[in-house]
Amino acid sequence: MSSSAAALAWRRSLRDALLRGSAWRGAPAANSAAARLASTASASEAAAGPKKVPPPPRKGRLLTGAMIGLAIAGGAYVSTADEAKFCGWLFKSTQLVNPLFALLDAEFAHRLAVTAASHGFVPREKRPDPSVLGLEIWGRKFTNPIGLAAGFDKNAEAVEGLLGMGFGFVEVGSVTPLPQEGNPKPRIFRLREHGAVINRCGFNSEGIVVVAKRLGAQHGKRKMEETSSSTSPTTSDVKQGGKAGPGILGVNLGKNKISEDATADYVQGVHTLSQYADYLVINVSSPNTPGLRKLQGRKQLKDLVKKVQAARDEMQWAEDGPPPLLVKIAPDLSKQDLEDIAAVALALRLDGLIISNTTISRPSPADTHPLAQEAGGLSGKPLFDLSTNVLREMYILTRGKIPLIGCGGVSSGEDAYKKIRSGATLVQLYTAFAYGGPALIPRIKAELAECLERDGFKSVQEAVGADFK
């Protein structure tokens, strides 16, 4: 791309983002009853006239202004710089915004970050990933193994922006069948000095209908991008990216708090959302939904997985078949629990496991923090050792036959490398991204590539489970 063409594209994207971002987004639907009475609610709102949306707090306006300023500066810079240098500059420049995010309420900062990504106020990675990071799994080629875990983009609002930042894959959700608000606020607590977060959000979700419409609209756009990119010559017969276009998209499914039939909730999620997913996740490990973790028991998990697999397989699929089905488990499990889960996974030929969700324990040094007693699941650096130990144990129990995604406490390329050597084929992060911002993504990928090359590995797949070989 020439510098003039790049500048024109940048200005157009900035203009479009400004137009789309002129109105601040309202809150999600309040409860499950609102979903069942959607038509009545819509009529009532029409009669009452448009809602008045309160302006964002002053800190939010300042932060938005700073982000727009960076975008304008980037537009000026790209006019005179080559694309690679511009990308590097833009990613590094986002670090200037991180201190401003720290001044905001945790949940408002998260909301603002999602809005920024959905409207294009984030850098877009144009540099190719190091070839050593590429791998193939489930018939899809990942350009790198670093993914964004579920919880950041709960309602699939910013998939394209997040994939564009350079993640190898993005997982949206957890998505529940009916809209629900989740637990009362405040429900997100920063333990900044420990690189950790405690949350008790409780599956706040706009529901599968809203998410399906959003993914459906994105699906068409991604399909066109895939068709366009397929005209370019390639040396590989495996598509780079997912069946719905460039980039791999996972959909994480949850259950409603008021639901008495968890299986029905997951089946409904599969029927509605699987057509847009490159892989599906059954989340049975959040500590913030009462009774959810009981589904990790051997009998309960076996019954659940069999019914969800059947629901997926009964749908009509093209040549590439149905999306892989994974289960996300907790780190707070006994040896017997892990053995039971491994047995179910092997017996039912589960496509993968995500290890792990947040912990209800308070690993050192987070246990000394004043907020440590807040209820909820802890994520971030203090979770790394616990989640990695569970990962290692599960790799042994499954004999390396089931792809594992390592999640929990990853904040550097070295951390990702340790997860891979411990048995992870892919790696996810979230909390470190919340603290470090977009600049973290290229740094982790570069560090991981250095680790692999340092130890003589020619690919990620060669290093998977290396500690046991």
UniProtKB/Swiss-Prot annotation:
GO biological process: 'de novo' pyrimidine nucleobase biosynthetic process; 'de novo' UMP biosynthetic process; pyrimidine ribonucleotide biosynthetic process
Location, primary (coarse class): mitochondrion
Catalyzed chemical reaction(s): (S)-dihydroorotate + a quinone = orotate + a quinol
Positions with a binding annotation for FMN: A150, G151, F152, D153, K154, S174, N252, N283, K328, S356, G380, G409, Y430, T431
EC number: 1.3.5.2
Record region (Disordered): 219-247
Cofactor(s) recorded in Swiss-Prot or TrEMBL: FMN
Amino-acid positions noted as binding substrate in the UniProt annotation, renumbered to this chain: K154, N199, R200, C201, G202, F203, N283, V284, S285, S286, P287, N288, N357, T358
Topological category with respect to the lipid bilayer: Single-pass membrane protein
Keyword field: Flavoprotein, FMN, Membrane, Mitochondrion, Mitochondrion inner membrane, Oxidoreductase, Transit peptide, Transmembrane, Transmembrane helix
Family annotation (Gene3D superfamilies): Aldolase class I
Cofactor annotation remark: Binds 1 FMN per subunit.
One of the record's GO molecular function terms: dihydroorotate dehydrogenase activity
Active site: S286
Pfam families named among the record's database cross-references: DHO_dh
Residue range covered by the transit peptide: 1-37
A GO cellular component entry from the record: mitochondrial inner membrane
Subcellular location: Mitochondrion inner membrane
Pathway: Pyrimidine metabolism; UMP biosynthesis via de novo pathway; orotate from (S)-dihydroorotate (quinone route): step 1/1
PANTHER family xref list: DIHYDROOROTATE DEHYDROGENASE (QUINONE), MITOCHONDRIAL, DIHYDROOROTATE DEHYDROGENASE (QUINONE), MITOCHONDRIAL-RELATED
Protein's recorded name: Dihydroorotate dehydrogenase (quinone), mitochondrial
Gene: PYRD
